[in-house]
Amino acid sequence: MKKLLLIIAAFITLSAQAQNDDINLSDVISEILEDAAQQDDEEHYTLAQISSEYLENLAATKLDLNTATWSELQSLPFLTDIKIEAILNYRQKYGCFYSLGELRGIKELTQKDVRFLSCFVMAGEPAETKQPSLHRMLTDGRHSITTTIKTVLEQQKAYREDSLGNKKFDGDRSAVCVKYKYSYKNYIAYGFTAEKDPGEPFGIGDKRYGFDFNSAFIRIQNIGKIEKIILGDYIVKFGQGLILGGGFSAGKSTASTGSASSGVSLREYTSANEYWFYRGAAASIRFKNFGVTAFASRNKNDATLSGDSSSFSTVKTTGYHRTDRELISKDNYTQYTGGIIATTHIKRFQLGFAAVGYKFDKMFEPKEQLRYACTRNERENYCYSLSYHYATTLLSIYGETAMDKECNAATINTIEMRPNAHIKVTAMYRNYSKRYLAFNASALGENSKVNNEEGLYLGAEIYAGRKLALSGYADIFRMPWPTSKVSSGIDVIAQADFKATKRYTVSLKWKCKDKLQSSPVEDYAKNQYIRLQNKFSPSDNTSIANVIQWSDYRYGDTHDRGYLIYQNVTFKPRQIPLTIAARYALFSAPYNARMYAYENDVMYFFSVPAYYYEGCRYYLVLGTQIGKRVKLQTRLSQWRYFDRNVISSGDNQIDGSNKTEVNVYLQVKI
């Protein structure tokens, strides 16, 4: 009887939620990744792009709450171990989830958790659990072919012919990516990715094999004790990412709700980014509360070689091979990687241990940028890591400590307190040795590199009833060795979200970063941002949002200010399978006071551009479903500047005040 009442209440709650809150994937990805993408660091933005595609893939293949395993739920980056345990305990107690609204009955899950989960999981009648035959797995699955194209309509400098009829870039101005995937439920999948960047030619030649980048994988899982086997390209994440970051970065704003897991996440790599992955074989085996994962990889990467080609000094992660000079850097060194991970889960305590070794076929001799730079010549390295997590209803303690072959250490440890269902407080301390070295690490920090940093993060979330949510954090950090950019600072965010009615919400966000810069003069640089957002849903299929942002930058004698105003409209007609999303923005800001804003885009494209100078920007995204097998999305966006007649510089220079981009996504399922 109690179960029946829970289901009825959950169904009513979920129906109201679906009609009025307009939960969509773009809003969720924006909340998770926008902060990470705003870092003035190319690697942070690249990881945010990979993370966006990862979340889109998770949403496209929703987890069934009635059959999802512990490790599958760990793939959701916003779920901690205590939340996963609560979901599984609920399922064990009540049998299964008939509605997503039942998640609201789990006290360990916040309102935000339930909203996020609705994009990535499904519920209903339990599916058949009998393992299918191999023939069925290989023949009864679904095929999908996806093509994405991105191009700039205006001619950029590198594509213009000189007096001799030559162009700097050999290829056309379009970025093209083709993906194929076959999958049968959660048992077997295989596929490939082929991609070329703008300016890269398509053809066969020196270091060219049709598309510039080619990737493939085969995944088998849930076969007896075999949890997962992957051949080809894959990603491994362990603990907090001190030695195995897994290519995922969500930034500081979600640190208090991010992964507090001591476990391991192994998944196939399907992104078009050419660096953050392993190429070889990996396998995970589980015996009740104990699991083992092993992997081996051999991967060629881009780098700048020394004069005699016996060493390399700079690793290139852009993946651009548009000119002969860029092509010279392609596949210049080979990285061999191997590792083993063991995890155990005993009641409230989880423990994990990982050992990873790296070896290059050439010596790595990084260029010294500063007299005090943290550089180190290496040809091989190995790291060890211990990850832990202990949780009760009111308290969670988790973290990871790692060490490289020279005994340089990195550690990150967190205490999370939940005195009641409405309040959560997080304290996190990190200390990364100035000479700590772990390739493919990705952990919380001010820098993308996991070294030379110490910091204290304090965060809180308060839910004052169903209408008001308060959240924020303060992150105090310093770099023990001076760098060319920042030596210390504090990063603060405070946000209030108020749900005035079922159809109207207002959000106010304040962000301040105060950091001591070493160049060009030693002084504090202070950035402040204020964002006010009003969101109104006049009907179930229409959403309107108005956003106003102000920015203020101070450094030495420089004082710059800026503003950004934009209007978003989303419309889904009931009569036809069409989705419309549009924005019109006005902005005026010097470069130092630039502002960022997440944008709707087609699948597998990630857009959080910086708004600066003076002008307007607008975009229109159209999406349609043609039957059950064809999905088409297209986006037209344009920058229009009022204060200049030349956009960008160097190879990307456009002679004019407009820059127009077209993105297209086409998926066919068979």
Model-derived regions: residue spans:
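Outer membrane beta-barrel
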Residues: R208-D302, M417-F439, I576-N592
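Exposed, low-structure sequence patches enriched in small/polar residues
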Residues: F169-R173, W276, D331-P366, T375-I670
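Outer-membrane beta-barrel proteins
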Residues: E195-F213, R267-E274, I328-D331, A402-D404, ...
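Transmembrane beta-strand segments of Gram-negative outer membrane beta-barrel proteins
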Residues: L63, S133-L164, Y182, N186-F192, ...
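Small-residue hinge/turn detector
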Residues: T80-I84, T110-Q111
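Extended, structured, electrostatic nucleic-acid-contact surfaces
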Residues: E56-P77, K93, S99-G105, S118-M122
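Bacterial Sec-dependent N-terminal signal peptides
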Residues: M1-D22, I670
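N-terminal, intrinsically disordered low-complexity tails/presequences enriched in Lys/Ser/Pro
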Residues: Q19-L63, P126-D140
